[in-house]
Regions:
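Short, charged low-complexity intrinsically disordered segments located at boundaries
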Residues: 21-26, 67-68, 122-126
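A cross-kingdom marker for long, charged
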Residues: 84, 90-126
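Short, residue-level hotspots on alpha-helical faces of the histone-fold
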Residues: 23, 27, 31, 35, ...
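Mid-length scaffold segments of soluble, non-membrane domains
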Residues: 1-44
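An amphipathic alpha-helical core segment
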Residues: 36-92
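A generic structural signal for ordered alpha-helices
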Residues: 7, 11, 15, 73, ...
Length: 126
């Protein structure tokens, strides 16, 4: 983090630090968590079928229906979602959402600044 980055975060929006971390850590976090998501998705659950296999079969059948005349008439859309990617994206989104909520609280609520460092950094803000 550069000095300029720090100033932009300090003077920025209620989620400026969170956005910085989204930009700087998302790729590394994805690489770290992907195996932890992939493993249970590929684990056999019932009758030797995994969640990933069930999802693949479900999307194949759904896309057949959505691509049919009836599906098109009903306005159904095909699904092109990779389950592993979707779960990973939503997990990171949720994590950063909670971080942003906490950051906003720290910036706007003196009582949320529970450490001397937070008090010093944000004490002169707002």
């Amino acid at each position: 983090m550069t000095f300029t980055d720090g100033l932009q975060i300090l003077k920025g929006a209620d989620n400026a630090a969170t956005q910085y971390f989204v930009q700087k850590t998302s790729q590394q976090l994805s690489e770290l968590y992907r195996p932890k998501i992939r493993e249970p998705l590929n684990k056999d659950l019932v009758a030797g079928i995994s969640t990933q296999q069930s999802w693949n079969e479900l999307t194949v059948q759904w896309n057949k229906l959505a691509g049919s005349s009836l599906g098109q008439f009903a306005g159904l859309k095909t699904v092109q979602v990779k389950l592993e990617d979707y779960i990973l994206e939503q997990a990171l989104k949720g994590m950063f959402l909670k971080i942003a909520e906490r950051e906003k609280d720290i910036r706007n609520n003196v009582k949320a600044r529970v450490t001397p460092l937070l008090q010093k950094v944000f004490g002169s803000q707002k």
